[in-house]
Amino acid sequence: MSPQTETKASVGFKAGVKDYKLTYHTPDYETKDTDILAAFRVTPQPGVPPEEAGAAVAAESSTGTWTTVWTDGLTSLDRYKGRCYHIEPVAGEESQFIAYVAYPLDLFEEGSVTNMFTSIVGNVFGFKALRALRLEDLRIPPAYSKTFQGPPHGIQVERDKLNKYGRPLLGCTIKPKLGLSAKNYGRAVYECLRGGLDFTKDDENVNSQPFMRWRDRFLFCAEAIYKAQAETGEIKGHYLNATAGTCEEMMKRAIFARELGVPIVMHDYLTGGFTANTSLAHYCRDNGLLLHIHRAMHAVIDRQKNHGIHFRVLAKALRMSGGDHIHAGTVVGKLEGEREITLGFVDLLRDDYIEKDRSRGIYFTQDWVSLPGVLPVASGGIHVWHMPALTEIFGDDSVLQFGGGTLGHPWGNAPGAVANRVALEACVQARNEGRDLAREGNEIIREAAKWSPELAAACEVWKEIKFEFPAMDTL
């Protein structure tokens, strides 16, 4: 009789409850190249040994339940169970441990981030034996990542489509995010694109409200794009947010965007859901649309240090589900992001092969094989004085997005865009000439401002603006 069909009739079924660690804590297990590996930060309840807590996580996120069941004998648990194969204390934290769990690949549906998360984090986070639980990292084996399409196009294809090389891309979120009419919204888009930006953007909560229905916004933004392209000779885009209450409505909006001939659409992937996002990503590849991803709601999931899911996991999931851009923090602006940790998941978004590096929060070596990369988007409370630091931190393969830092310019939207474009070009030129952006950044901006009155005005407005709060996301 095969292992999968062998029963326990010969030994008799013994009902009852036994410790998880007897079955799911396997410190001698050697991980396989095809296993999905997870690193959980576990905070057990008082009196619960870390081995039992780690084993409980492995059990409840794979084949286990609270009691022995008769149907265990109808399959091979050794083949399908998750295994807690290593536990280590968290330095500097009391009663916190990193539990490493290996999952056999057969537990997961191919090409489904939804199923992967339903298994690994779907139920275990409410387990009473744990005070708190955080998924810090996942190792996605090539055998699984190859079942995903991934980003619709990727970094190089996007550059080729836009004919823009050798520098970060520049964007702007239109403000106020809610309340503008479609025509005034389109006017703001045109002014920003005419001034030198590559992209403008719908804010995450701009969908189809009474003051501005989606079809009207799409039409006026398309008009703005074509007018700005004709005047500047550059390819322009606006992230048209296709997020909607149903997948059918979302696809209808994406189809209309394609019919208008615009280059890019947008989706809120966490509030919209991974199933909807993957469907949209497939449509975008098939129809030549770039896909910008907003991470609205991420901080509800990832901001607490001891409970939830770290953003590096959500970033990996997005690369699998599909997106050409994703917001990734700024390090220097108003939103969360500690430098080394942020650069860790930026590399996980962009690079093909990323070595394990615990100093940057990377618990596993990740090999994406040929899955296209994702451009990280720096957005939130940034302005021209941040440009040298952003250029140095994020490099060329990034999108730098200035909302208030464009639209808050004292002379208007187009001069605000000019100021940002001049600051960026000055920083890129200085870097290419061998200057140190970290040390000489302010001087570089001041030099450029001498021949750009728009930049000089922006420098004066934002010279005192800083967001100096400690990052919550630390190792």
UniProtKB/Swiss-Prot annotation:
Mg(2+) binds at K201, D203, E204. Binds 1 Mg(2+) ion per subunit. Keywords: Acetylation, Calvin cycle, Carbon dioxide fixation, Chloroplast, Disulfide bond, Lyase, Magnesium, Metal-binding, Methylation, Monooxygenase, Oxidoreductase, Photorespiration, Photosynthesis, Plastid. SUPFAM superfamilies: RuBisCo, C-terminal domain (SSF51649), RuBisCO, large subunit, small (N-terminal) domain (SSF54966). The modification N-acetylproline is found at P3. GO terms for biological process: photorespiration; reductive pentose-phosphate cycle. InterPro entries: RuBisCO (IPR033966), RuBisCo_large_chain_AS (IPR020878), RuBisCO_lsu_C (IPR000685), RuBisCO_lsu_C_sf (IPR036376), RuBisCO_lsu_fd_N (IPR017443), RuBisCO_lsu_N_sf (IPR036422), RuBisCO_lsuI (IPR020888). One of its GO terms (molecular function) is ribulose-bisphosphate carboxylase activity. It holds the Pfam family RuBisCO_large_N. HAMAP family: RuBisCO_L_type1 (MF_01338). This is Ribulose bisphosphate carboxylase large chain. The gene is rbcL.
